[in-house]
Amino acid sequence: MNTYLLRTSLAVLALSLLGGAGAAADLSLERIHADPPLAGRLPRQAEVSPGGQWVSFLRPSQADSEVLELWAQPSDGGEPRKLVAAADLLGGAEQRLSEAEKMALERRRISQRGITGYQWCGSDDRALLFPLSGDLYRVRLTAGGPQAQKLALPPGSPKLEARCSPDGKSLAYVQDGNLFSLPLTDGAKPTPLTRDGSATVSWGLAEFAAAEELARQRGYWWSKDGRSLLALRVDESGVAVKTRAQIFADRTALTEQRYPAAGEANARLAAFVIDASTGAQRELPLPAGCSRSRATRPG
């Protein structure tokens, strides 16, 4: 009898708990899509710094999970700390993205705003580089805390695909289809490494087929000593122009872009070794077939 009563009591308790859980689990469609996300504010692009002192990552803002901030945590323990947020640098201004930047983020499957990418600059674990609203910023890790500074570069079109040299003494970037190098010293001016960039010719950028089909998001690479770069020149003049729809929350727009449809022409590629100081170029022969947008990556 006691066993029967015990089993009955447990059954009643289980049913009551299930009923409560069912009531608590009721979610509206609005809550499912509201902020904060039910899965939590998950970090992305986690990296260990070159010297192993830090673990860096992008973290959604507490105010808006669609805005990413740059954070880091000591690798030997300690609390994570925010290094910089877009709002700290833009001063209330709205973040700007060019069409080229939007397409690059789309190819990386990134829908958030704010600081959407970064890299460690050099091997001493003291500086990181990131793009924001068409400009480039460097944040230094100092004894007094992180200090972010916008790099003094010529105004105009956004600086794309910025990458520091392995020693952290220089960086390269793409602007208006051309590749530039810049020593990271006070008062230094960028050096144009190429000059024939145009609406159909670009240097140092991954074209559509490379990014979508070959998982190659880069178009140039620094040498280990930081003295030269391997860069791809992309000629899309033979790629057909297609019209595609862009769907926004409140409207739909039509835009034209060069799109290598199946069975049609791809972009033509050429590879060059470029001196980072002078821009002197030496063309490298590509394997058969790679000249038509089928180069994967060095090595």
Task: Give the role of each language-model region.
Residues 8-19:
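Bacterial N-terminal signal peptides
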